[in-house]
């Protein structure tokens, strides 16, 4: 499923508080963006126990229970983890990864909040979650009957909200500082090949690994840090993260270059740092320069003016990296008006610098 509108982490918390008490909610989203953690946090916030069932590992009898003979009749005894006396949050994770038979077993539980003769305690909440088919995850077609029994939302990662959470949770400062500079690296679409990719979960995993090594007597070696980074996040992001850590003593380098107080690193040994700073420069331009030139304010006008000279300086150091700053990448391109000015002004800037 691909819904036309998305919600952030904070919006999901508000939505669950207002909707899930009345109707079951299904959360769609890519792997690793925090669906399970947000449901657990919601349960904690409302003071309810959270019981998680993993749809991909369930059989129908795990839900409806087993029959019990009572005189001349029988009834199904629901499993203990579901049949509770106090209200709770029932979280059906990977619901769209279970078989059609299991989906059918969930019908009455989701729609009527009952299994056979057992009814969920008053005040209980039912929430489902699952990955999307375009994410390369193992999913099955969800029946229309099941879809129609739930309210659907699509969750996306929000960098600012994740950083707020990360600071409170003690995520390693290398990670938070890096994502602050490269917010576009918090999440990357799942790749077609079998390799790690960046998600809030994988950055959290990298943070835990770095903190585990840092707790020892010896500082973490460059080789081990390289292994940890490339084993956790997207290869491109891992390489730039390593360059960022290498330059950690001057994490404000890009701002200093923009202000004219520093220059791009030009030594061959600093080529990885140059690439990271150039990528950060491109990301800054994409985020801050408006598509319509009429929307420029004083700050963005100064940035655009300074950016032309910076691209000229980059071209003197490494033409390929300078081209990377202005080229189309992942369907993202710099504003057309800015590119026209680059083509118009760059020869003059180069001649002036000779």
What are these regions (language model features)?
Residues 1-181:
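AAA+ P-loop NTPase catalytic core and its hallmark functional loops
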Residues 2, 35, 41, 68, ...:
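Context-gated lysine
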Residues 2, 6, 10, 18, ...:
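Detector for Asparagine
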Residues 8, 78, 221, 250, ...:
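Serine/threonine-rich low-complexity intrinsically disordered regions
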Residues 106-110, 275-277, 281, 321-326:
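Conserved short hydrophobic patches within well-ordered secondary structure
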Residues 298-354:
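Long, positively charged, glycine-interspersed low-complexity recognition regions
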């Amino acid at each position: 499923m691909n819904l036309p509108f998305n919600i952030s982490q904070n919006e999901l918390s508000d939505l669950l508080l207002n909707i899930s008490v009345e109707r079951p909610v299904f959360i769609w989203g890519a792997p690793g963006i925090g669906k399970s953690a947000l449901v657990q946090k919601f349960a904690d916030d409302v003071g309810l126990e959270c019981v998680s069932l993993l749809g991909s590992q369930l059989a129908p009898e795990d839900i409806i229970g087993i029959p019990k003979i009572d005189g001349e009749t029988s009834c199904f005894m629901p499993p203990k983890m579901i049949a509770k006396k106090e209200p709770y949050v029932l979280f059906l994770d990977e619901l769209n990864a279970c078989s059609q038979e299991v989906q059918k077993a969930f019908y009455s539980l989701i729609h009527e909040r009952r299994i056979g003769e057992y009814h969920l305690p008053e005040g209980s909440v039912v929430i489902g979650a699952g990955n999307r088919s375009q994410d390369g995850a193992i999913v099955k077609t969800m029946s229309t009957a099941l879809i129609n029994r739930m309210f659907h939302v699509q969750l996306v990662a929000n960098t600012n909200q994740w950083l707020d959470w990360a600071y409170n949770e003690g995520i390693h400062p290398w990670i938070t500082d890096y994502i602050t500079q490269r917010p576009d690296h918090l999440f990357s679409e799942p790749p077609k090949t079998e390799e790690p990719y960046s998600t809030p979960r994988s950055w959290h995993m990298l943070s835990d690994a770095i903190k585990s090594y840092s707790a020892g007597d010896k500082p973490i070696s460059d080789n081990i840090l390289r292994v940890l980074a490339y084993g956790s996040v997207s290869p491109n992001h891992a390489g730039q993260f390593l360059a960022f850590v290498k330059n950690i003593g001057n994490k404000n380098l890009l701002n200093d270059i923009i202000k004219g107080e520093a220059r791009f690193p030009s030594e061959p040994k600093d080529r990885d740092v140059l690439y990271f700073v150039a990528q950060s420069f491109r990301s800054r331009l994409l985020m801050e320069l408006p598509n319509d030139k009429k929307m420029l304010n004083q700050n963005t006008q100064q940035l655009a003016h300074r950016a032309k000279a910076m691209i000229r300086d980059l071209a003197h150091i490494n033409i390929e990296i300078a081209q990377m700053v202005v080229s189309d990448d992942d369907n993202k391109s710099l504003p057309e008006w800015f590119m026209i000015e680059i083509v118009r002004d760059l020869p003059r800037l180069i001649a002036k610098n000779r």
